Design a protein with these regions (language model features):
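Active-site-adjacent structural elements that line small-molecule/cofactor binding pockets in enzymes
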Residues: 1-134
Length: 134
């Protein structure tokens, strides 16, 4: 929050922007249930884990990712990285975004949904849109 406050207080209007504008991006996995969203998020989580190790592997399917052999250290790292993503039902994710918008005061939020299949991505975006339009 402090960095946003510094930005707002230090902002100098220019030809390009007359007011400060804060845009944030969320990596999300949204499904009908939290459990399904967790399951579908595993490929993204395993990819991040491998990237942290400098490994570039093909993206795993949810089935492969959930069967991926994890060490205790891997599990700890996944747990530490968990706050970097919003995972849950549409209601849970939208509530978290709204809470953070109220706290941080950002002007715009972009959603990045890198689920394994295009149908999973479209469903995630559809569920979010429906919840946001309630």
């Amino acid at each position: 929050k402090a960095i946003f406050d510094v930005y707002r207080n230090s902002f100098q209007p220019s030809y390009f922007m007359d007011q400060p504008k804060i845009i944030t991006t969320y990596a999300v996995s949204v499904a009908e249930t939290t459990e399904e969203a967790e399951y579908l998020s595993m490929p993204m989580q395993i990819t991040r884990l491998n990237l942290m190790r400098g490994k570039l592997l093909n993206v795993l399917s949810p089935e492969e990712a959930n069967d991926y052999p994890l060490t205790e250290m891997d599990k700890m790292i996944l747990q530490q990285n968990r706050p970097l993503m919003l995972i849950g039902s549409a209601e849970e994710v939208v509530n978290q975004i709204k809470e953070e918008q109220e706290y941080f005061g950002f002007d715009e939020a972009m959603i990045n949904c890198n689920l394994y299949t295009i149908d999973q991505r479209l469903n995630s975006y559809r569920l979010l849109a429906e919840q946001l339009n309630k």
